[in-house]
């Protein structure tokens, strides 16, 4: 439930405020898309943490570039066991 609400707020930002601000994100995927992917992959708590951490790195002194959402640690452990 919280995850869906957070995704709704990010989508609201993407459709209302983001077009007014222009392309300012230094990363791919953009910070807002990263937040949605992190929420979908990791849930509300860890996804929000990863998203906020990413937004804090998005500033003029960071070179940016490709920065994918990390894989879930549970899935990584399951893959390494098999």
UniProtKB/Swiss-Prot annotation:
Keyword Disulfide bond belongs to the record: no
Membrane-related topology note: Peripheral membrane protein
Highest taxon of the lineage: Bacteria
Region (Disordered): 63-82
One cellular component term from this protein's GO annotations in UniProt: plasma membrane
InterPro entries: Membr_insert_effic_factor_YidD
Keyword match Membrane: yes
Localization per Swiss-Prot or TrEMBL: Cell inner membrane
The entry's keywords: Cell inner membrane, Cell membrane, Membrane
Family: Belongs to the UPF0161 family.
Record NCBIfam families: membrane protein insertion efficiency factor YidD
Protein role: Could be involved in insertion of integral membrane proteins into the membrane.
Name the record gives this protein: Putative membrane protein insertion efficiency factor
Organism of provenance: Protochlamydia amoebophila (strain UWE25)
